[in-house]
Amino acid sequence: SRWWKDLDFVTTLPYARDRAVECYFWTMGVYAEPQYSQARVMLAKTIAMISIVDDTFDAYGIVKEFEVYTDAIQRWDISQIDRLPEYMKISYKALLDLYDDYEKELSKDGRSDVVHYAKERMKEIVRNYFIEAKWFIEGYMPSVSEYLSNALATSTYYLLTTTSYLGMKSATKEHFEWLATNPKILEANATLCRVVDDIATYEVEKGRGQIATGIECYMRDYGVSTEVAMEKFQEMAEIAWKDVNEEILRPTPVSAEILTRILNLARIIDVTYKHNQDGYTHPEKFKPHIIALLVDSIEI
């Protein structure tokens, strides 16, 4: 999109993933209906932006820099930019500008106030990224329970689910309040995303010296092999799927339209991490799906 090209992160932040097309493909799995075009664009931009933030924590910086970056995002004030090193200034300004754009866009329908909920989720995930970065830099390995309590947020699904409602005119403040309580279906979805991601990315993270991974934490806590830990995480994914389906079928205070976004976010995980491979980080795995959906015509 023009927005992504204008940011030019490919040049200014060469460590970051360039995944604009993959981000939009992801959102097509969340809502394919034409009336959700605004929602798709907002969600795609957020996925692209959180990838930049995630890659910043993964690939760059020292604890002190991450601490200042995290604090600046909690304060959410452009005046904080002067505290940051140059490479962090780029993503910080882009992040604040993006949410300003959301507020301006939603103000046309009198809904700018709901952007607050998405901002709070962004602040939350950044706090949790900071914890993970400290673990990595300091060589700390948490217990698997401590790991998961932090890693559910860094799955991105608290943030992305909240963001998925921004462009839906039917999503009211009450829906955002409900989501902010972390209902069971959201917890299950975040768990699903987390453990499936951990299985798919284990070898890559191990190769770059990451010891505080879910699989490694489970292996140490229970004295088991990699294969057993992977099987346990797969079992956790299956339980999470059952919880998602159960919550979809039972009476809830929100409509099917609202719940379907959560269900579809779960479904797209199956595509992204098909055969335990990370299709987002390695887009060649995604390419056949993208071509089939957005390029090839349907034969009649």
Swiss-Prot record:
E.C. numbers: 4.2.3.21
Annotated localization: Cytoplasm
Binding-site positions, Mg(2+) 1: D54, D58
GO function terms (MF aspect): magnesium ion binding; vetispiradiene synthase activity
Binding sites annotated in the UniProt record for Mg(2+) 2: D54, D58
Induction info: By elicitor from R.solani.
Catalysed reactions, as listed in the record: (2E,6E)-farnesyl diphosphate = (-)-vetispiradiene + diphosphate
Top-level class of the enzyme under EC nomenclature: lyase
GO CC term, one of those recorded: cytoplasm
Binding positions for Mg(2+) 3 per the UniProt entry: D197, T201, E205
InterPro entries from the UniProt entry: Isoprenoid_synthase_dom_sf (IPR008949), Terpene_cyclase-like_1_C (IPR034741), Terpene_synthase-like (IPR050148), Terpene_synthase_metal-bd (IPR005630)
Any GO BP annotation: terpenoid biosynthetic process
Pathway stated in the Swiss-Prot or TrEMBL entry: Secondary metabolite biosynthesis; terpenoid biosynthesis
Key words, A-Z: Cytoplasm, Lyase, Magnesium, Metal-binding
Coiled-coil intervals, chain numbering: none
Family: Belongs to the terpene synthase family. Tpsa subfamily.
Function, as annotated: Sesquiterpene synthase that catalyzes the formation of vetispiradiene from trans,trans-farnesyl diphosphate. The initial internal cyclization produces the monocyclic intermediate germacrene A.
PANTHER family linked to this entry: OS04G0344100 PROTEIN-RELATED, SESQUITERPENE SYNTHASE 31
Domain notes: The Asp-Asp-Xaa-Xaa-Asp/Glu (DDXXD/E) motif is important for the catalytic activity, presumably through binding to Mg(2+).
Name of the molecule in the record: Vetispiradiene synthase 2
Organism: Hyoscyamus muticus
